[in-house]
């Protein structure tokens, strides 16, 4: 873009792109590609430098600061050439590395170009100053521009998202991320500004402004100041930091028109309301109010303008240099006005804000001698209570003495000062948070419009990553959110991108960018993660922050790499744990986390809030439900659950919703970078920026953009869009596959063919190539358009020339005609022609114009209706697309639920393992306790033995004492000694008894402990036994199924030879089952047909009854009318005879008078004949026009209806194909996921298989039932449509007849009036006749003119109709071409998906085939296992497909229900039309009566005329000629009178005929309505029956295999019962047929009676008595017929009940057969699973063997290395010995030299200085050599030591490898044992499958027999039917 093109950006141009001059200067700058480099630097990360020299892998360079550095060569990175300076897309850099990206951003930032593209996303750096790049001029310049056509900007990202939304018809999202202070909020505002301005530009003509409110665009923009005032605050890093997250969705209509908007907010930082750090401040709204810009606010809120008067808002800073609080207050207040807030709402918000400030000033103190708090002054409490609409005393009482519920009673609790202060802060935070949420909801209400919306663009602005000195719970939530968003970015940019390459079959090596953050996310949110433990601790009443910390340490310290113990630094707040986030390590302080998470409130004060007189406050807390709130019935559970939800759980729920929304959109990423910590404009802190670039994945994103293919297009779209580049590459006439066409097209273009790749469904382009193709396309289009314009100009010029020639010819003709006219204009006959000619056409054309106008009006209404219908269809299509998006969201939610279920399953498996470990530990403890118990029992026995010995000693002593009592005196000394011994013994005994007691107590304690432990062990063993039993049952069932499967496989191999024939047999079984299902459906259909016929006969009987009643009523009416007609006719006859007599007398007189006026009479007759002819022509023309208009109207309506049906069909086809496409994609995903799941866990697979089989059976039954109901509904709909069409056609015919009759009536009345006027004129005078002649001529002229006008209107109408038809044809072709094209594309996608699926299956088979190289003996078994794995995958895919098809069927059923409701509404409307027609019929009757009255008046007037004629005859008696003329007039009048009477009679007859038709139509309407209601009831009953059947199927599936025998016996019993029921049904049917035959006879007789009645009606004048007798006969027969019909109805109901019973039993039998078949298939699937496990184990064995071999090779290599090292060591030792020898030699030489030196000294003393100098030089050389040799010797010693260490390491490694080899060998042996065990299990499963197969065949045989019997019974029923028909026809013939 040159400077002239940049002029469109105005003053923003230099801030967006380099000028041409700068580019030229950069290109001429000196640059050496080999010397100009980047080198690393400690402070600046990297600096520019020039290479001075290169030596030995090191480079010496001079930096740009003049410093010389030496670095390794691999640390030196090349600079890019000067033309890449300040490049707009860093993906285009030649050398892509960290310093290149850093310096490009730095240089652009220095020129204030803050936006830079980085591959697929945009990087922006906060300028910390205002730049003129956001004005309206810049917005207009970016509108509609491609990304490559304009400089990088947030507006370009926004416009691209907008264009993608319109072209791809997909929701978009713009994710603006970065650290706090990086400029996210400003960029969010700019995005919203762009969309608002674009919408305003595009919709200025239709913009409407509500009074008091702004436009929608203004409201969207003004939502920001309001949100910022209440949600933004100053932080350490940002003066205007958003302390909440927001996701703004801007909704657009189908055409891109702005429709509405809504805002979702996340995680408002409530704690800031009452606490701020020193360098921060509270939310802006507090300081805006205190700015005194609106003094009335200070008065209203009872506050001063000093922030330091209020404790809550003055803990940090109170002013910000970059923010003018006064101006911001006015902006906030104005925003409220624009958003439509009322003054009451605004004042309420200000009052609550002021009340929070007063809350912070409330003080409390301890009561004397008590620990309870009391208010220390009530002034602030009074103010806050006044502002909140509360009672101050109640507020203070609620704070100091809240009421707490204890049991069922409320108790007043005393609070200390600390508790009261905490409650005050919590209430202030809760009020502020709820007020903020209410404000967001109120804004959303304002932004919600009723305009249709289809797509949205979401803008996410959420708090950036935060690392403060003091990080609490809020920082954890914010950082966790940023982790999830960064993971979403990484997954979208790196994982999904590369996975798509693999799916599309592009050669691609997966690049691991090391950006997986899942470990940190799992640590926070997974079960037993940080938030889970926090929520668990909140559940326990005695939990504290320290117990929470202890649990964290127990679960994660040392176990998770992201969880660390923090290092507490002096001067910083204490930290309790540290987390390693993607942006750095954060130390968290957990003080108060439990309280913050539970967020408790003082419920006494909350109750006061609910009763507040301030409406806003009471609304905020109206729905608050605390722990003590009484629960209402029916709502208690919901309220309790919602009130207990913690802050962390709510945040996770909102975050998951946000991530789901983002996944359903196409994301655009904007990375905001903070340049420095000091907020200095233009300064880049290199380490800070590099840290952000690394964390944000900027470099990785550029690399994958460079290496990968960021642009991709479907083959069909590419071919359609770029075929224009070379049309010859794709021939027009022949069909070429889209992929081949794209390959040919790209191969024929002059581009780099390495820059693109062909996938399965898309063509992939490297960065920049698609832009080149777009440029080529634009050039090609411009050339084509230029050529078209040239050709168009030529055609237009030729047309203009042709017009000039035609104009010349026309002028010549006109001149010739004028000359001819001038020659004849004075001719008298021509003058007469000029006078008469205009008069002929005027009247006729006026009438034609009137009719044409009416016709035009009708056609216009029809056209408007068709347009409305088209709009409805378009709206319906939009709603269907919306439903598709909703379904995609539901599918995404279902996938998330599935993932959660898998995680829970994994957790359960882990819990099982832990429980088993605990059980093992408890059993070990039990064994220890038992050993201790045994020791104690042994000690106890020993002590008991000692006690018994002591007792025996005591007994002996007592005996001796008794013996020596006699010798007492003699043996006193002995007694004393003995007593002393006794005392000692007693003491010993006492000690022993004490010890015994202690031991007994210890023993008892041990027994108790043992009993407790035994109880625990029993419970654990019970649990273990249950688990083991469950596991054993599962394993037993698996083993049994494996045995059955093995038996089956052996049988199949014996019978068919290989596994493929087995699959064919399974397919045969399925085909048999399908045939059985089809036969069952056929039987059901035939039974339904029988029921329908019976019901039709019932309906016919009821209709006949109704017709009889109506005919009776009609007969009575006809009798009355006949009587009236007789009297009227008698009067008319009498009048006619009188008139005839009078006319005869007049004729006699006239004959005498003669024929004086014969000439006038002849002229009159001619005029009358001409008049009649013109009138007939006019009537014929009008009839013809009406017929053509009706035909055209009908044709137009049919075409519109046909188009509507075609559109519906095309939409259904499109939806079906799209669903099939998504299903194929999901099936492919399911195949891969099922493979992974099979490998992961056997238990998981078994469970999933069972559920899938159950679902498959359920869905299959549902699908069949749904298909039946859908077929019924379609047939009903078709029938109703045909009936409706027939009725509408009949109504049209009736309308035509009625209009014809009304026209006839009008003509007759007109004729009567004309006759009257003519009689008066002829009687009065001859002059009146001349006047009448003139008026008749004038009338003729008017009629001709009217006729001409009508013809012109007709032509105009035909033109309009042809135009409408052409538009209809255009629409039809458009829809057909679009649909065909879309269908072809979807078919191609379907084929490609099928090909991909087939390729995936082939790849799986190939991978499985590789495993067959284990051993030759296992080859056959391995192949079978692989095939079975394929079967498992197919069954899973089939189950998933059935599940999806079931959902599709449910959706189709809902659509049909909707269509049925629409047809019901159409039926009601047609009934309304019928009623309106009946009212019109009554009007016609009234008109007919009025015409009769007019006839009477005419007759009276006729009498008067006759009297006048008699008077005239008396006057003209003298003239015979006059009499003759009057005689002629009399005859003429008589003839006209007869014609009038006949016309009147015909009109009466036609009216009666029309009345009969209308009555019949009403009857048919009523019958249709009754039939529809009956069918609806039947369908409801069938659906209910299907529901019950489904429940029965579920119950039957839940029963075990043990019920199989019972089901077989039940089947036999049912079979017998069915046979009996069939016999009974045959008897009942024969009886019903007899009754039906009799009813038919009676119907025929009734029909004959009706015919007689009709004849009697025609002859009612002659035979009134006969008619009465026939009516009596009809009444008697009608009563008989009603009685017989009642009996017939009872019989039909009985047969219906028996048929339903038989049908139900047949369904149950088929369900049991299906159950057996599903069990068989489940056994087969389980066998496949076991064999898959076997193959997995074999692959593990193979891997282990391979590892063993690798280890052996490593050991060999290590041994060879050791040998080599030993040789080297030996060499080193030899060299060392050689050096040692050399050293000794050198020492010897030194001694010799020393000796020589002595001699030399002596010589020197003797003989000269020169010799001395030489010797000294030689000594120095020798000393140098000695030093060098010593150094070499030391180095050789070091090398020897290194080699010795290397030898030791190698020997140790060989020993380790040997041990690993032994372990692997043991593992191989174990795995082989498992393989053998699995083989045995597979054989047992095969045996069981054989038994089930035999049972299935037996049941199938029984089912076949039952069906044969049903066929026999059906044939008998058909015979009986035929007989009944024959009997009925015979009866009719006899009658």
From Swiss-Prot:
<dbReference type="Pfam" id="PF00063">
    <property type="entry name" value="Myosin_head"/>
</dbReference>
<feature type="compositionally biased region" description="Basic and acidic residues">
    <location>
        <begin position="1923"/>
        <end position="1935"/>
    </location>
</feature>
<keyword id="KW-0787">Thick filament</keyword>
<keyword id="KW-0597">Phosphoprotein</keyword>
<keyword id="KW-0514">Muscle protein</keyword>
<keyword id="KW-0488">Methylation</keyword>
<dbReference type="GO" id="GO:0016460">
    <property type="term" value="C:myosin II complex"/>
</dbReference>
<dbReference type="GO" id="GO:0051015">
    <property type="term" value="F:actin filament binding"/>
</dbReference>
<comment type="subunit">
    <text>Muscle myosin is a hexameric protein that consists of 2 heavy chain subunits (MHC), 2 alkali light chain subunits (MLC) and 2 regulatory light chain subunits (MLC-2). Interacts with ECPAS. Interacts (via C-terminus) with LRRC39.</text>
</comment>
<dbReference type="InterPro" id="IPR001609">
    <property type="entry name" value="Myosin_head_motor_dom-like"/>
</dbReference>
<keyword id="KW-0175">Coiled coil</keyword>
<dbReference type="GO" id="GO:0030016">
    <property type="term" value="C:myofibril"/>
</dbReference>
<feature type="region of interest" description="Disordered">
    <location>
        <begin position="1907"/>
        <end position="1935"/>
    </location>
</feature>
<dbReference type="InterPro" id="IPR036961">
    <property type="entry name" value="Kinesin_motor_dom_sf"/>
</dbReference>
<dbReference type="InterPro" id="IPR014751">
    <property type="entry name" value="XRCC4-like_C"/>
</dbReference>
<feature type="domain" description="IQ">
    <location>
        <begin position="781"/>
        <end position="810"/>
    </location>
</feature>
<keyword id="KW-0518">Myosin</keyword>
<dbReference type="InterPro" id="IPR027417">
    <property type="entry name" value="P-loop_NTPase"/>
</dbReference>
<feature type="coiled-coil region">
    <location>
        <begin position="839"/>
        <end position="1935"/>
    </location>
</feature>
<feature type="region of interest" description="Actin-binding">
    <location>
        <begin position="757"/>
        <end position="771"/>
    </location>
</feature>
<feature type="modified residue" description="Phosphoserine">
    <location>
        <position position="1510"/>
    </location>
</feature>
<dbReference type="GO" id="GO:0030017">
    <property type="term" value="C:sarcomere"/>
</dbReference>
<keyword id="KW-0963">Cytoplasm</keyword>
<feature type="modified residue" description="Phosphothreonine">
    <location>
        <position position="1513"/>
    </location>
</feature>
<feature type="modified residue" description="Phosphothreonine">
    <location>
        <position position="378"/>
    </location>
</feature>
<dbReference type="GO" id="GO:0005524">
    <property type="term" value="F:ATP binding"/>
</dbReference>
<dbReference type="InterPro" id="IPR008989">
    <property type="entry name" value="Myosin_S1_N"/>
</dbReference>
<comment type="similarity">
    <text>Belongs to the TRAFAC class myosin-kinesin ATPase superfamily. Myosin family.</text>
</comment>
<feature type="modified residue" description="Phosphothreonine">
    <location>
        <position position="1282"/>
    </location>
</feature>
<feature type="region of interest" description="Actin-binding">
    <location>
        <begin position="655"/>
        <end position="677"/>
    </location>
</feature>
<dbReference type="GO" id="GO:0060048">
    <property type="term" value="P:cardiac muscle contraction"/>
</dbReference>
<feature type="modified residue" description="Phosphothreonine">
    <location>
        <position position="1309"/>
    </location>
</feature>
<feature type="domain" description="Myosin motor">
    <location>
        <begin position="85"/>
        <end position="778"/>
    </location>
</feature>
<keyword id="KW-0547">Nucleotide-binding</keyword>
<dbReference type="GO" id="GO:0005737">
    <property type="term" value="C:cytoplasm"/>
</dbReference>
<dbReference type="GO" id="GO:0032982">
    <property type="term" value="C:myosin filament"/>
</dbReference>
<feature type="modified residue" description="N6,N6,N6-trimethyllysine">
    <location>
        <position position="129"/>
    </location>
</feature>
<feature type="domain" description="Myosin N-terminal SH3-like">
    <location>
        <begin position="32"/>
        <end position="81"/>
    </location>
</feature>
<keyword id="KW-0505">Motor protein</keyword>
<comment type="function">
    <text>Myosins are actin-based motor molecules with ATPase activity essential for muscle contraction. Forms regular bipolar thick filaments that, together with actin thin filaments, constitute the fundamental contractile unit of skeletal and cardiac muscle.</text>
</comment>
<dbReference type="GO" id="GO:0000146">
    <property type="term" value="F:microfilament motor activity"/>
</dbReference>
<feature type="modified residue" description="Phosphoserine">
    <location>
        <position position="1269"/>
    </location>
</feature>
